Amino acid sequence: MIREERLLKVILAPHISEKSTVNAEKHNTVVFRVAIDATKAEIKAAVAKLFEVEVESVRTLVSKGKTKRTGGRVGRRSDWKKAYVTLAAGADIDFVGGAE
């Protein structure tokens, strides 16, 4: 069993992009930015508990940080992890819905 404090720290934010919107419409898949050390089991449990939906599968990838320059200095952005969460048929997560 994963502790509730950990589940709250796993999901950082929804990742909204053109690709994630198409995936949501066609494949019932939602994309999240997650903690770099999060496992698929933790992500699945966190989404199921926080959004009260049934999760079918989780796919993850680590996006490498870009090298950026500011003046003469060279720096690097942090690596971050993205999770594609496929929801069960009929399940839906509404991020932009207001009060009804």
Curated annotation (Swiss-Prot):
One BP term from GO: translation
GO terms assigned for molecular function: rRNA binding; structural constituent of ribosome
Gene Ontology CC annotations of this record: ribonucleoprotein complex; ribosome
InterPro entries: Nucleotide-bd_a/b_plait_sf, Ribosomal_uL23-like, Ribosomal_uL23/eL15/eS24_sf, Ribosomal_uL23_CS
Annotated PROSITE patterns: RIBOSOMAL_L23
Keywords: Ribonucleoprotein, Ribosomal protein, RNA-binding, rRNA-binding
Binding partners and assembly: Part of the 50S ribosomal subunit. Contacts protein L29, and trigger factor when it is bound to the ribosome.
PANTHER family: 60S RIBOSOMAL PROTEIN L23A (PTHR11620)
Family statement drawn from the similarity comment of this UniProt entry: Belongs to the universal ribosomal protein uL23 family.
Job of this protein: One of the early assembly proteins it binds 23S rRNA. One of the proteins that surrounds the polypeptide exit tunnel on the outside of the ribosome. Forms the main docking site for trigger factor binding to the ribosome.
The name this protein goes by in its record: Large ribosomal subunit protein uL23
